[in-house]
């Protein structure tokens, strides 16, 4: 039999010479046939479950969807036939009813004007969804999306089932849930040719039904996209090139004071993007200047030379109306000091030309930890002190969680704590040093090479600066605070999170520029000693932008590849330092790292840099030709393992109750790999499906990742990682031993009003689920961008930016997530067991966790501290202030004083 065939394109209702359903034999259609078989099986006594299996359905739910679809299809056919017989064949209704063999009343109902629309609602819903999937490729069809279409959840389910039968498919993708350590699972409808990896790579392109639009209170569909950019004319901009001193302020945007459309509001500085002529944009740190030439409102400083045309100095806007700058900008609702809108001289509200990425105050809480790429290059004694302090803090946290009285809340926090400790073992970040803060760096030529303007520190204080990625002690400037300098004082005054340095100091910070680069400032004292050294000779006056400029035909580095290569070269430098590389060898690696840092931003020729600095040779010598070779670099490096089953949460299925260790279960999945031989023949073999995990995740004992050199600093980090693994296991064991909340029917009756109130609050919190998922997607995108800009951000700040990003995202997509606020009486009802554990779990997910935790903590716990917390306070007493200890321990300053004097 031939496999050739002619495929018919069209739809059942719209193709063919005669209307769908107008044929003489109603059983010619598959719907009639299927329903007839179902009816016959039912008459023979088969149950619904048995009929589902016999008719090829996956389960009873699938059976009901198929049946509903065919019932609608048959009914639509009957309506079409009734209209055809009456309107086209000119039969009387009575005659048409006779021909069709149905009662006259039924036929008349078929002729009602909106009857066809009502019957075809599933079909119309399916067509609307199909249209959006064809346009957007990835569409969220999860809980609540039916509201956007004005249909019931059941109708939506049936429409999706119909589309699945037409070749579309439902897939699930998970994203991080902002504010918790949980995942949000998004149900996505795609075409059949979209595999899971493609969906995962494009998760930020998932749209919600309605096409990223929401329905307002009047039923009108309104866009949730950001307002179009307002551009400034290039005629108002001047360029200060390298020959005129632009290099010393590279990345600084000087603004004329008092000009409304470029005002910074109450802020003295901000990291901004400014659209120019609708085609280009400026990016950098904006400051006010009182020394601009007449007719110039903006002066942009660059290290480019005078032969570069003005518009080539600027960057081209990206062809993406939702993200033209390639960076997340703040909306008006997020700004505290920097202007977004202004009122013009006619009293009208106008959009500012200033688009803010970070404003004054945003950098204040960054990097309250010490990354291993810095601390591992310091003394093992200092590293151990800071890692021990981090362990002491986590030990105290676990004791506090174990003291909680509500089992559901306790388990939530134990699970989150275990995940945090597993992550800490991988990332190896230590506690911050006293007075340590991240600041954005700004240039002031009046400062000497050994001076810093730092209003957060006292005059005369000696400090060091650390910038990431960190190459070595030769990249750490040692400076003295001078807050008396007029120039920085007049420009940034008492800046909350900015410091002033000159361009020579910036060069030592691995070639930092001033478009928003940051540095960690660490004050030195008798208890804090940081190793530093002079710059390596081969790095003096090295400018990666001058040494490796763009050349025609070269491969341009992508943002993703930049992150990979930064990790590769950072690991190489770490391993070289531990293994005693020479200064000349370190110069080569660090020069290449400086090129990699700026390669994507300035389109640098990183492949030529790799050749010139012979990076492959360094990897052969210090990494055995492979990748990471010490625990510092190996911990986060990825390895492939057989694919594992994903279990979410903690249970006896995925956790050993005796040890608390995770139980690894392989999926056993395989695929056929075809190998072509030289003679043209093919060989096929079954190969296990793999997945990537970090090396630290793959071992129970961190010492297995220590190099053959067994360096002292490696031992310090291995010990810390094992302590984190032990705490995680302890938390999981405690979770499994913690019982469930006992539900009490009598308590439900006693607290019936409170139960009703809690259910209403929860229903309201869950009512905008689709928009909340869109907000979670957008928030993840914002956080990813922030983490890419500051990969060594500490957990505390990551938590803060997640919260901030979610607020921004909710406002942007129109989601109105409402936190549930509990009354004392409602809490009493919860403690009495008036609601189920599942309901309480949902309430916790939609409440302020700190507030819930406070209610669940035994009275007096804030003053009668655990032994672990007392030990934490005393371990910090010799180097930290009372205020710093109180902040880290989560207690008042008076409580700290009480225990230190005990």
Task: Give the positions of each predicted feature.
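Short alpha-helical "recognition helix" segments of helix-turn-helix
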Residues: 49-55, 93-100, 144-146, 884-887
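Short linear, low-complexity motifs centered on an aromatic residue
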Residues: 17-35, 610-611
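A short beta-strand element within the Helicase C-terminal
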Residues: 517-521
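Charged, low-complexity interaction regions
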Residues: 44-46, 91, 580
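Short coil turns linking two alpha-helices in DNA-binding domains
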Residues: 58-62, 103-106, 152-156, 892
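Short acidic, low-complexity intrinsically disordered linear motifs used
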Residues: 2-23
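Key DNA-contacting residues within the recognition helix of helix-turn-helix
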Residues: 63-64, 108-109, 157, 897-898
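Beta-strand-enriched accessory nucleic-acid recognition/scaffold domains that flank the catalytic cores
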Residues: 37, 72-84, 88, 116-491, ...
